[in-house]
Amino acid sequence: MIENDFLSTVDEIKLREEVKDFVRSVDPELLRKMDRNEVDYPVEFLRAAAKSRLLGLRFPKEYGGRQMPWTAEMTALEEVGVLGMGLGCTYAMVSIVGEALDRFGTAWQKQKFLTPLIGGDKLSAEGLTEPRGGSDFFGTTTRAEKRGSKWVINGEKRFIAGGKVADFYLIYAKTDPKGPGHKAITPFLIEKEMGVRVEEVYSLLGFRGMGTARIVFKDVEVTDRHRVGKINGGATVFNHMMVPERLTSAAGAIGTARTALEIAIKYSTKRKAFGMPIRSFQGLSFKIAESVAKLDAARALVYTAAKAADAANKEPSVDPRRLVSEAKCFATDIGWETINLAMQTMGGIGYTQVYPIERLLRDARLATIWTGSNEIMKLLIQHEVYEMMGEPSRDRDAEMDAMEWYKKVEKVYE
C-alpha cells in the first residue's frame, strides 16, 4: 500500500493498524447507499467508530478522547479517507466542532455536548456559509440580538454537512450590528429542538448521503450558557477553528487519492494493450511515479503542519496557520490531480461505477473549495510570507552575493 510510516511514532503506527481494521469492517453497501442518497447521514458508521474509541482522538480522556497529538489524528484521517471524503468529513466533524468545545467551551458545554459527541450519542454540524457569503466569513448576516436574558437569533446557513440530522449546531452570528466584522461576531451552540428549521437538502455532485442542508433560524432563543467564548470574540474562535477544518481536509484528501492511485496501479499490471501490460508504457508509469512522489510530499507537509499545530497547543506564540493553509491547498490539489490520473489510467472503465474512481473524483472536487477555497489559502499564505519577510532577519542576505557592478546597475526597483 502507498503509505509512509517514517513520519509516525510507534503509537501512531499502531493507531494506523487500528483504523485500518475499522475501515475494513465498513460495509461497502453503505458507500453505495450514500452515493444514491438513500442514507440521510452515516450515523451507524459514527457509532461504530465511537465504539472502537476512534472518535475525538485529541481530546481529554475525561470526555472520552485519548489525548493524542494532531499527528495521530492525521494518521487516522488518512485511513478513514480511504473510504472517500464523505465518510472522512463525517469522522472529522467530531474533531472540528469538538475543538471549539474543548478549547473555548465551559465545563457545562463540554459535559453536555463534547462527551456525547465523542461517544457517538449526539450528531453535530457547523454553520459558516450563508447565501451571500462563503469565503467572506466576517460578512455574516445572521444576527443574534440580546433581549433580556436571552439571545434571539435570526438568519440562515447553507451547504451545512449533517445539517438535516444534527442534534446541535455550532454557528456564528453578528452580535454588534455596527462593529467591524472581526470584532462583531459571536459563536453559539444551538440545539435543533430550540426551533432550527431545515428548509432544503441539497443534491450534490459528490459528498452524498451527508444530509447537506440549508438551516434557518427564526427568532431562535438561547441563553448565555450556549454562547462559546466572549461576546464579539468570534474571530478568535474562527481563526483557531480553521486549523482543524483545514488539516482534516488535507489528511482525508491524501487517503482518498491514495485509494484511487492504488486501484489504478493494480489495474495497470493486469490490463493489456498491444500485447503487454499498460504499466510497461513509460508515459503511464512515469505519471504514476510522479503521483506517488507528490502524495508523499503532500503527506510530509500535512504532518509538518500537524506538528506545528501540536507545538501551538504548548506554546501560544507559535502560529501554525501558514503551514496549515499550505497543507490544505497542496494536499487537496494533489488529491484531485491524482484521482484524475487514476481515472485516465483506467480509461473508459474508470468512468463507470464498476470501480469507485468516479465517486472518489466527485468527492475530491469539493475539497479544493470548502473550508476556504484553495485561492483563499494562497491569499493567506502570501500574506503570512510577506509579513514574515518584513521582519528583521538573522539569515544571510543572499542578494548581496551578486557582483558589485550588477548590484548597482541591474537592481532597479522603481
Can you say where each PLM-predicted feature lies in the sequence?
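A short, Trp-centered hydrophobic/proline-enriched beta-strand micro-motif
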Residues: 120-128
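Long, acidic (Asp/Glu-rich), low-complexity accessory segments flanking structured domains
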Residues: 219-237
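Alpha-helical interface subdomain recognition
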Residues: 1-83, 87-88, 104-109, 116-121, ...
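Flexible, small-/acidic-enriched active-site or ligand-binding loops
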Residues: 139, 195-223
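Short Ser/Thr-interspersed hydrophobic loop/turn segments at strand-loop and sheet-helix junctions
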Residues: 53, 76-81, 173, 190-195, ...
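A short core secondary-structure module
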Residues: 150, 154-198
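Short Gly/Pro-enriched turn/cap motifs at secondary-structure boundaries
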Residues: 132-135, 159-162, 178-179, 204-211
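Conserved hydrophobic/aromatic beta-strand scaffold that supports enzyme active sites
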Residues: 125, 141-143, 150, 168-172, ...
